[in-house]
Amino acid sequence: FLSQVDPIDGKFKTNESTTQVHWRTLPFYERVALVRIQDPAWTPHNLVAYYLTDQGALYRLNGLSAPIHDVNAKAPIKVTDENVIEYLKFFCFFVRGEEGPFLIAEDSNDQYIPTEMDDNTRSVIEGTVRPATFEGKNENGHYLCDAVVFYSNALFIANFAVEPTGMIQMLDDDPIAADLPVSVEAPIS
């Protein structure tokens, strides 16, 4: 696998002795796996590269939506009442804005929520995060979801419509806390 992707993005060299590769299946695809690659020699040190793999084809998750939509069309995606929240979390994490992921913040102990912060900030985050919810379907068959989003240094409550094809639309977002002294740091490219 490493020989297929080395160097990642033309700049991150892999090494059989130091590069860690992990994979897992995703419940909204039958044959697609998510591959996670990390190496302590890379800068920034918290960089993690991700790929989707479908029957040998690799799709680099680089912050853009195109690789996900390509896999959704090819695999194809199968969104259900039971897996829509996991798909929403996946999509929002891997499709980036200028300031990083749209982290669906369900728990203050999430690995991507900063741990170093003052007590007031911790209180705001702990008092805001909550499990994302599936609220049912609309007349178009879109899955309606509600979630707390941690983007950059702000928290929002957002409402989403997830289409069966995997397209996601943020219907509404209300800021809860802005200009926090911490932000989500989870580089993928």
Language model features with spans:
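Acidic, serine/threonine-rich low-complexity disordered tracts
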Residues: 132-135, 140-144, 148-189
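Extended, low-hydrophobicity segments enriched in charged/polar residues
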Residues: 1-127
